[in-house]
From Swiss-Prot:
GO terms for molecular function: iron ion binding; N(6)-L-threonylcarbamoyladenine synthase activity. It catalyses: L-threonylcarbamoyladenylate + adenosine(37) in tRNA = N(6)-L-threonylcarbamoyladenosine(37) in tRNA + AMP + H(+). It comes from Pseudomonas aeruginosa (strain UCBPP-PA14). This is tRNA N6-adenosine threonylcarbamoyltransferase. Belongs to the KAE1 / TsaD family. One of its GO terms (cellular component) is cytoplasm. Binds 1 Fe(2+) ion per subunit. The keyword Manganese does not apply. It is found in: Cytoplasm. InterPro entries: ATPase_NBD (IPR043129), Gcp-like_dom (IPR000905), KAE1/TsaD (IPR017861), TsaD (IPR022450). HAMAP family: TsaD. Substrate binds at residues 134-138, 167, 180, 276. Required for the formation of a threonylcarbamoyl group on adenosine at position 37 (t(6)A37) in tRNAs that read codons beginning with adenine. Is involved in the transfer of the threonylcarbamoyl moiety of threonylcarbamoyl-AMP (TC-AMP) to the N6 group of A37, together with TsaE and TsaB. TsaD likely plays a direct catalytic role in this reaction. Its cofactor is Fe(2+).
Length: 341
């Protein structure tokens, strides 16, 4: 089965073609970072308009690169949620229109299920069951995964997601958008131990997260430095390192708890923040000590992309699931509500 996947949940337009027998045939992505950078964050209306502009050229590009024609496509998969409602509607409308024109079924895919399954595109994919850490700009969740659609939520952020905290913190200390890569870049030049930030909610039982207080702690630290006349680049680097270390160690502590609680040995990390090298290194070291294994997608499939949507959609289509012709999206959509495959 060949499935064309469309991703438009936020500020990246992604298109990919996945073959259930041959794997990923082609993928293309257009990022709107430059469009939104001047505003310091994503402007939903601008995101929707740019998806309209980019979608059809990217579909043509993927078909050309794969050597396929519309007659070779068996189905369309698209992100139906969660995400920005306008952006989701662009993708859903396009998917349903193309599916109707080509005479093939369409299926809406949960954006975070796409992220969760992205490591399945690698040469050595994880096997069920495993614990998944979903960590992105909109979500920070620990999930027990026993199969596709068989998800048990173990813990989640009660306020800001980790990726959101990275972006907001970067803005507070005068860095550009997107903040995650900027903080990681500065952290490489930071002085270890100059600042020590708290590890939120690690001094109590449970697997929930909280990052809003850490963001405030960072702001107060920066303001004290500025008031003391120390707003140097090195101080920014030191604060960036302290913040990143606090987030990473908090995630490590919770992941260790989740693995011990479930008795599982394999961990999947997925979502945009899973590209962070400090997080990857920390998890690899921890899983090595626990005689377990950590799995993640290649960096370009950690952020939003069409390949993960094509793959996830293909699995559900092979199980006989598909949508009717109505255009429907869910900006808020609990992953645990998905049917099992």
């Amino acid at each position: 089965m060949r499935v064309l996947g469309l991703e438009t949940s936020c500020d990246e337009t992604g298109v990919a073609l996945y073959d259930s027998e041959r794997g990923l045939l082609a993928d293309a992505l257009f990022s709107q970072i430059d469009l939104h950078r001047v505003y310091g964050g994503v402007v939903p209306e601008l995101a929707s308009r740019d998806h309209v502009k980019r979608m059809l050229p990217l579909i043509r590009q993927v078909l050309d690169e794969s050597g396929c024609t519309p007659a070779d496509i068996d189905a369309i998969a698209y992100t139906a949620g969660p995400g920005l409602v306008g952006a989701l509607l662009v993708g859903a409308s396009c998917a349903q229109a193309v599916a109707f024109a080509w005479g093939v079924p369409a299926v809406g895919v949960h954006h975070m299920e796409g992220h969760l399954l992205a490591p399945m595109l690698e040469e050595q994919p994880p096997r069920f069951p495993f614990v998944a850490l979903l960590v992105s700009g909109g979500h920070t969740q620990l999930v027990r995964v026993d199969g596709i659609g068989r998800y048990q939520l173990l813990g989640e952020s009660v306020d800001d997601a980790a990726g959101e905290a990275f972006d907001k913190t970067a803005k507070l200390i005068g860095l550009g958008y997107p903040g995650g890569p900027e903080i990681a870049r500065l952290a490489e030049r930071g002085t270890p131990g100059r600042f020590v930030f708290p590890r939120p909610m690690t001094d109590r039982p449970g697997l929930d997260f909280s990052f809003s207080g850490l963001k405030t702690f960072t702001l107060n630290t920066w303001q004290r430095c500025v008031e003391a006349g120390d707003d140097s680049e090195q101080t920014r680097c030191d604060i960036a390192l302290a913040f990143q270390t606090a987030v990473v160690e908090t995630l490590l502590i919770k992941c260790r708890r989740a693995l011990k609680q479930t008795g599982l040995k394999n961990l999947v990390i997925a979502g945009g923040v899973s590209a962070n090298q400090a997080l990857r290194s920390g998890l690899e070291k921890m899983l090595g000590e626990m005689k377990g294994q950590v799995f993640y997608a290649r960096p370009r499939f950690c952020t939003d992309n069409g390949a993960m949507i094509a793959y996830a959609g293909c699995q559900r289509l092979l199980a006989g699931q598909h949508d009717g012709p109505a255009i429907s999206v869910q900006p808020r959509w609990p992953m645990e509500s998905l049917p099992a495959v």
